[in-house]
């Protein structure tokens, strides 16, 4: 069996100032690392969304009744009942782009670094794997 990925979450109790306004919204979920088999029979680690107050139940991206508060999500992770937290984007006016496998030895590859530099007015972070980047900003559309 493959070893569970290392999770990089930072200090969840003190969210960065750029994301602080999002904590007032009831759009938060948690996720555990789960090892699943792909259609080809290989094993792959996934991060399925779970309800912040009850991580035994799935959260759905199109069902706000399955989302919770930031405080509930952080408490669930701190109790060890999930590995990380997530924010549901649907209808929020927030958009995110994940750049996978673009961090090498702690530094973004050149094209990813350039893209991030051009994405003014956004918040950027390293993904939980430590190997990717996420760009978060305001968005319109579905």
Residue spans for each PLM region:
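Conserved phosphate/metal-binding and DNA-contacting active-site motifs used
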Residues: 1-142
